Amino acid sequence: MARVHNFSAGPAALPTSVLAEIADEMMDYRGCGMSVLEMSHRSSMYQQIIDDAEATLRRLLSIPDNYRVLFLQGGATLQFAGIPMNLMRRGRAGYIVTGNFANKAYKEAAKYGEAVLLASSEDTNFDRIPTMADINARIAAEAAGDGLDYVYICQNNTIFGTMYHELPNCGDVPLVADVSSCFLSQPLNVERYGLIYAGAQKNAGAAGVTVVIVRDDLIADGPAFAQTPQYMDLKTQAAKGSMLNTPNTFGIYVCGKVFRWVEETGGLAAMAERNWAKANLLYDLLEQSELFHGTTQGDSRSIANITFRTGDAELDAAFVAGAAEHQIQNVKGHRLVGGMRASVYNAVTMEDVQALATYMKDFEAQHGLSQRSN
């Protein structure tokens, strides 16, 4: 059976060349007589796998030596609690709420200290990133007042299709970012952040691995709370090389393959060029369409998640059903917002996006305003 055009928001499409490599090595990894699935995480062979994955990621992102790279489990959701557990030393952190996942992180942090709402776009149904001048002014005021342990953002909002195109100016306050759905989609200056993390299942690999990149000084004294579970202690995880317990060995192996694929296909600058070409093909179509309309403000558009709708729930459902008949899968919008969403992550090809665009045009020709008025 031919592969479908997969626009899933995560777990998402993987590069076909990576899938082929994994299949080729499944029964016998490089002549060792066993699968990576069967390999001890304490073996020298597996240590080489995890070391290579980290080294490749460090090259891709030019990660400075004073940052640790961790391969953890529990997804972004575990980090909603893990970040305040490790960083909320004064008991006060700032949150910018631009969608569902940022809001979850904000509410979770409030269990451990004062979570200060610095800005939100909930008043316009999260269709934008708040004005950066207002964000920066609020950060400066809070930092000068009672202080902030960190400022937290979700850099790309998978559900609502928005993205920061400019980072907040946090001064000496560490910036913490969930970059799950934009990780490795374009260049990123790690030194602008105190901590970033990403669920691997969108752009970096298979579900089950969370990549955490954290600056040494933020974890040097251990977690902020004595009762922090050992697994959540980032200092301990760093000291143990992500092997405090058995890690997701196969997931990390897949991540390493994806990191290498990104590097071999031109790195992050080339990836960004391809990704914006894919996204802009759909954004341009939406601007010209009389049937479909995008749901985000133009200056906040995501590189990865393009959200749109017709304004008619029944027509949206018909579009999704028809897409499946054309081998176009996973374009139904998130259950919280409805409509449609095309996630055009790294492994989604221009051919995939062109197939979707062609179907959108054909659907509009059949169901557009001119047809409904006849």
Where are these regions (language model features)?
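Conserved N-terminal alpha-helix of the aminotransferase class I/II PLP-enzyme fold
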Residues: 33-79, 86, 100, 108
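A glycine-/small-polar-enriched, mobile loop at the entrance of the PLP active site in fold-type I
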Residues: 3-54
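Conserved PLP-binding catalytic core of the aspartate aminotransferase-like
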Residues: 292-322
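Active-site C-terminal subdomain of aminotransferase-like
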Residues: 200-283, 297, 367
